[in-house]
Regions:
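Surface-exposed, flexible coil segments in extracellular/virion-facing regions
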Residues: 155-172
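Loop and turn regions of beta-sandwich accessory domains that flank beta-strands and are enriched
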Residues: 1-150
């Protein structure tokens, strides 16, 4: 956590800092400040000098559903758990955190388009993995439930000696 910065950008270029734990030097921080979260991992990291991933945990960020404060606040309070893969280290609990800058700063952004998650690792002494990421929008943005049903017009199966023989299906 100590050398990481994370930013979310919407299609028109507006952005917020999700967290900024890097407060030192290295390749140079992308954002000013940082809470110096060194020695704390996100997930159960395998810090043995290899490039093998550890065990990914789920970290969510929400202005309204957060169980915890910002990662900076929780780090300052010492709210960490012991790691199992790298004994003697601590990791942030998997939970829902407040972002450092409110998602309200993205009001007015177009929903359609490319949303970008920028994560910067400022020190080359370790590695990191993103196991999964997603973004969910408030359903009130588009309250019209949209669904569709495909109707099979014609379907055929062609027997053959291989499981890779094609099946032909037409939808209408």
């Amino acid at each position: 956590l100590g050398d990481l910065e994370m930013m979310l950008s919407c299609p028109n270029g507006d952005s917020i800092i999700v967290f900024n734990s890097f407060g030192g030097t290295g390749i140079g921080p992308a954002f000013a400040g940082g809470f110096n979260g060194g020695g704390t991992y996100l997930g159960d990291a395998l810090d043995d000098g290899t490039s093998n991933p550890g065990i990914g945990w789920t970290y969510n960020f929400s202005d309204t559903l957060a169980d915890w404060g910002t990662m900076a606040t929780e780090h300052g309070l010492g709210n960490t758990l012991p790691t199992t893969l790298s004994p003697g280290q601590g990791m942030n609990p998997d939970s829902i955190y407040l972002p450092e800058q409110t998602f309200d700063d993205l009001i007015g952004c177009p929903v359609n388009g490319t949303w970008k998650l920028t994560i910067r690792d400022n020190l080359a002494v370790d590695n990191g993995y993103i196991f999964d990421w997603a973004i969910f929008f408030n359903p009130y943005i588009n309250p019209n439930f949209e669904s569709y049903t495909s109707t099979i017009v014609d379907a055929q199966w062609h027997d053959g000696n291989s499981v890779n023989d094609p099946a032909v299906t037409s939808f209408g």
